[in-house]
Amino acid sequence: MRPIVALALMLVLLSVGCGKKGDPRAPELATPRVIQNLTATQTPDGVALTWSRPTEYVDGRALTDLVSFAIFRKEISPTCVDCPVPYRPLTTVNVEDQERFVRQKQYRYVDEEVQDKMTYRYRVSSQLRDGSLSEPSNEVEITRGP
């Protein structure tokens, strides 16, 4: 009796197959469009960064799972302007209006941890719900004056 049940089960599994028949498809590219309008301005409190929220993936579909923006900074030493310095994560700005009908279009962050006479470079990446990051934005540079 057991061999008959096992054989019947195997026949059922073989007849069902595994998935839809057809040509294989490459996974969809679900990366947000790159932020291209990052700006940096000096304020009394530090350096203000502003940028626009991306609304689409690179393939043109509407962006639906944006959760935050990752801000990266590097400090350029006045004594070694050409030294290779890596970008370091500075902070994360959360997107809290994903379920709202009208979403925020512009974002702003003020970096208060800056020193006078230092040069800083910044870039921003969009972060999706799965933790993946977009390509970095345009790079902005600012020298903090006294």
Model-derived regions, located:
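Bacterial N-terminal signal peptides that target proteins for export
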Residues: 1-7
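Processing junctions and N-termini across compartments
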Residues: 9-12
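Recognizes extended acidic, P/S/T-rich segments that occur
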Residues: 52-53, 63-117, 132-136
